[in-house]
């Protein structure tokens, strides 16, 4: 799970009719020509091409409140820079200042969200209101108002994805850094619109963070307790999925628990779940009959899940008028953020979902299980090194090893050395990662200033760390290590990070895959582990690939039905989930109209994030092959330090070839 810093209380429900009309650029061609003429008269004809590009970039974002055409022309003539020394000086100054501004504001944001993100006690109404405060929402607006952004737009080019794919291979690191800096001003979004987006994501995130199911209160079809441990509290969807995974190899009792969890998931996505069973240890619930024990009425949850998603949709849709080159959130996520066209991502996922290797693997899984596949077997965990070990056994190991947050913090150097990082590098990393007690399942929150530290949020109960929490924490640690390298050891701050979220997920997966090894419980040979890794990665990509297609389909539907009500979105989501299942899963599982692909919480709180997980599995497999050929720690550092190039350039630098699922399919074969 990537840091939720960007998914941070209730957005304004803005319908099409209530969206405020955006201010529009007001500069005509004559004013642009006059600006170019003034610049070339001052700096020479050799600067005409740069002058025209810069003047046009400014004009495209110059609103009436910025001044009339005369003011625009004067600004361009007065602020155009020529010569390498002047341009380098301006870039260096901007890069230095932006690191400090963005970094300090992130630290403020982290502090404001502390009561909601961390398990520090009850969350008050004041805490919730403070969580709505996002000072960073106004930064770029202020940079436009003060014309700092216009100075940058006048002097440095804004590149498109097409530009980078065409010319990026020949660019220097300086050119890449300048190009990345200018991404922040490619769009001009008013602060109030950005604030609404922040509030919508915060509301969705906090809704999900409190969505626990009391497994110890679940009843089976016969009305009897299913035997989950007392106090077992599972957040949706992460813990539900991981609890389900943990019961393979436990015979009929494990199978009964898995079927119950699937039924819980179905009740959640259909919004048939009785509202009062959510995080309530005082009542029992039979998800098969949907009856609640304890007396009293038990009305269903009133489509809150889909209302939160609509709030997110309407908030991000309000950005559309300010993004002429990417006028939908879908386009912005794929072309600006992910930097891989939507159609290309879909094609890549379908290549896995329809591959003969998946069908062959399904037969292998059926053989291992000794029964026909059931829908929840999309989360089959029998290829992991923990197969055959009970959840209770693993919990006892992790509780003893990591009884507190402080103990996990103290163990970071040894964990990192166990992964293959040199002692001095393990110490360097441990000093830059802070472990916090998470209120939710856990996440990684990176820094934006090299003097700051990244934060690993992990959920450790008073009785000690459970295996599920440990598994998530090792994944999040992978994010933190990537964040530490891609910020702390980058040559240009403007290049900090990785091309998109899929890449940090990929690097985190390489940590998570070794969780049992770090506990000293990996007993298979290296060859056997590699084979199981290929099977697990292929099956995991098959599962999350379908989930991603549902996520993408839901966003397309919302854009086609912008005035939809929560109940309509619920029915559309379920229909899309059934359609994807029937096309790519029913032929293998032999069951139609299954809806559990819609259970992922990311669909509600993270806005089209799920395709990054699918891409992450594919990237992780390609990267892991390189890591095996050398020192894991050294290779991880090498690839992470490349920074925020295009996905294609990053992959070629990391593994010597483009992003492709073929390596995964070949290995599984």
Q: What residue spans do the PLM features occupy?
A:
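C-terminal, non-catalytic "cap/extension" segments appended to globular domains
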Residues: 23-259, 263-291, 319-389, 562-669
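Auxiliary, metal-adjacent structural segments of Zn-dependent hydrolase domains
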Residues: 390-452
